Amino acid sequence: HSDGLFTSEYSKMRGNAQVQKFIQNLM
């Protein structure tokens, strides 16, 4: 289902953004 694929990709991107924000807070 393309909708589920989009959701997983979106959640992956959101997780990536949160990780980058976390790394920026460490630096």
From Swiss-Prot:
Post-translational modification Methionine amide, affected residues: 27
GO biological process, one term: regulation of synaptic plasticity
Coiled coil: none
PROSITE patterns reported in the protein's UniProt record: GLUCAGON (PS00260)
A Pfam family per the record: Hormone_2
InterPro entries: Glucagon_GIP_secretin_VIP (IPR000532)
Gene3D superfamilies: 6.10.250.590
Predominant subcellular localization, coarse grouping: secreted
GO molecular function: digestive hormone activity; hormone activity
One GO CC term on file: extracellular space
Keywords noted in UniProt: Amidation, Hormone, Secreted
Compartment list: Secreted
Summary of the function given for this chain in its UniProt record: Hormone involved in different processes, such as regulation of the pH of the duodenal content, food intake and water homeostasis. Exerts its biological effects by binding to secretin receptor (SCTR), a G-protein coupled receptor expressed in the basolateral domain of several cells.
Family recorded in the similarity comment: Belongs to the glucagon family.
Protein name: Secretin
